[in-house]
Amino acid sequence: MRAVCLMLTALLMLEYVCRSDTMSTCKSLDLELVKRKRIEAIRGQILSKLRLPKEPEIDQEGDTEEVPASLMSIYNSTVELSEEQVHTYIPSTQDAEEEAYFAKEVHKFNMKQSENTSKHQILFNMSEMRSVLGTDRLLSQAELRLLIKNHGLLDDSEQRLELYRGVGDKARYLKSHFVSKEWANRWVSFDVTQTLNEWLQGAGEEQGFQLKLPCDCGKPMEEFRFKISGMNKLRGNTETLAMKMPSKPHILLMSLPVERHSQLSSRKKRQTTTEEICSDKSESCCVRKLYIDFRKDLGWKWIHEPTGYFANYCIGPCTYIWNTENKYSQVLALYKHHNPGASAQPCCVPQVLEPLPIIYYVGRQHKVEQLSNMIVKSCRCS
């Protein structure tokens, strides 16, 4: 009986939250009030994800100082990767769910210039990575990114690009990607998170990947009919310049520093659904557009890029959900029996959320980080 009473108490609290929460609504509310409260919620959310106790103080020189090109390159690559993954659903593991809340620091590591570019080897300085990342960092995601340049692919032809971990006789197959003419001037990404985790925990000073085309037994070795930007052998000043170009093969790495992953919060990732935007005639749960301007709405000058973003929010009534699939149906029925005049109506809540990459600075130090679950893309009744 005590357990039932506790569950009923929890449901009463749930109803109160539904009536007052600004992210989700169970009844019609003043939209301006919802907007103001949503903006204030975002203020606290961003500071919390960055583990900042308060807004950073503005350094006038830092505000006008130009962001280094290397950081802009990292930021642009992060934005591109986020856009590519918008419609990709990746089943989340328990570890992924636990680390999803806090902002991820983003680092970009270009490949080392190698004498073996003709063999399509991509080498990385692991000592440099360990020096930059430190030892107590939780690796969240690592993507090997290659910019495809069309060389001899015909309209109706394609080649399968195979990625191997290691080079030479020790190379081990990881995954592949089909490349056709439509991939010209586009980035191909390979998830190499597990491999990077193992390399970072090891002691090797240099590690690499190898690119190959599949070999059919008894047939001549197939030639690459496309090029990968930055892998051609260059000389002199041209080589030095190429090493700094954003089109060179690189690893984009997102991680949690020790002070963030020591107190992980669990946030559940959900499968992507279609985006349902509210209209003037909407009478059910939907996404209402809301643009947040960091300077105008929050009074912040310490976020350099972007200047704002569409945070959006969920609003609209939800009908009662009484079905066998709802694991709370029996508890709700019991609650309804003991409280015939009360309501345990479901709320309109976010279903799919997307990340927001930012460049911000504390004092005169610029950083690139990715804030998870910042953009509401679809809603559901729950």
From Swiss-Prot:
The post-translation modification note in this UniProt entry reads: Transforming growth factor beta-1 proprotein: The precursor proprotein is cleaved in the Golgi apparatus to form Transforming growth factor beta-1 (TGF-beta-1) and Latency-associated peptide (LAP) chains, which remain non-covalently linked, rendering TGF-beta-1 inactive.
- Name recorded for this polypeptide: Transforming growth factor beta-1 proprotein
Region Straightjacket domain: list its residue ranges: 23-68
Disulfide-bonded cysteine pairs: these are C278-C286, C285-C348, C314-C379, C318-C381
Q: Which Pfam families match?
A: TGF_beta (PF00019), TGFb_propeptide (PF00688)
Q: In which tissues is it expressed?
A: Expressed in blood leukocytes, kidney macrophages, brain, gill and spleen but not in liver.
Indicate which residues form the motif Cell attachment site: 235-237
SUPFAM superfamilies under this entry?
Cystine-knot cytokines (SSF57501)
- Organism name: Oncorhynchus mykiss (Rainbow trout)
Role noted for this protein: Transforming growth factor beta-1 proprotein: Precursor of the Latency-associated peptide (LAP) and Transforming growth factor beta-1 (TGF-beta-1) chains, which constitute the regulatory and active subunit of TGF-beta-1, respectively.
> A single GO CC term, please?
extracellular space
